[in-house]
């Protein structure tokens, strides 16, 4: 296969994975599952798969798509804690844009793809090692998303997040948010 056709093939594969991320983001109850306090997400799954199949750079691009769709989704369909993910939703007790929400919405998602891609690349080999590398990359990618998003929420919006959920940071769930 020539270099040009290999490049085109890779670009098409990345575009298809990005389309899956966008599709999951905007189909109700598919990519974001509303829970009592926050929306659980499955959108990180194609980001991790893309990172495993296409590498850390592609994983970072897919993570960026995930982050941008998260901002859009939380802006057009706000929930109680959407101020953590959209600069257009003011945090309780604040007026005006909250630009730290862009850090929470985008940076961890980019790092999901980068981390998963590098873990896979470092661990992958033949046979069982490849399976282990896929599992490790999936776990690291999921943990990267959860831990960095929750830590960002605690760091930038801890009091507002606790207030939106009627839970002080000193309560056990507030402590869990801090511990993450």
List PLM regions with ranges.
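Loop-helix junctions at membrane interfaces
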Residues: 1-180
């Amino acid at each position: 296969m020539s270099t040009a056709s290999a490049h085109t093939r890779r670009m098409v594969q990345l575009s298809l994975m990005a389309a899956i991320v966008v599709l999951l983001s905007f189909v109700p109850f598919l990519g974001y599952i509303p829970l009592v306090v926050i929306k659980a997400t499955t959108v990180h799954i194609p980001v991790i798969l893309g990172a495993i199949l296409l590498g850390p750079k592609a994983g970072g691009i897919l993570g960026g798509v995930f982050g941008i769709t998260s901002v859009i989704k939380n802006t057009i369909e706000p929930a109680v804690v959407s101020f953590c993910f959209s600069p257009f939703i003011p945090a309780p007790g604040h007026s005006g844009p909250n630009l730290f929400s862009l850090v929470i919405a985008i940076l961890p998602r980019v790092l999901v793809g980068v981390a998963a891609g590098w873990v896979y690349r470092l661990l992958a080999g033949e046979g069982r090692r490849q399976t282990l590398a896929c599992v490790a990359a999936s776990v690291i990618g999921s943990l990267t998303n959860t831990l960095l998003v929750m830590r960002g929420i605690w760091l930038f919006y801890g009091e507002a997040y606790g207030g939106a959920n009627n839970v002080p940071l000193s309560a056990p769930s507030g402590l869990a948010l801090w511990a993450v």
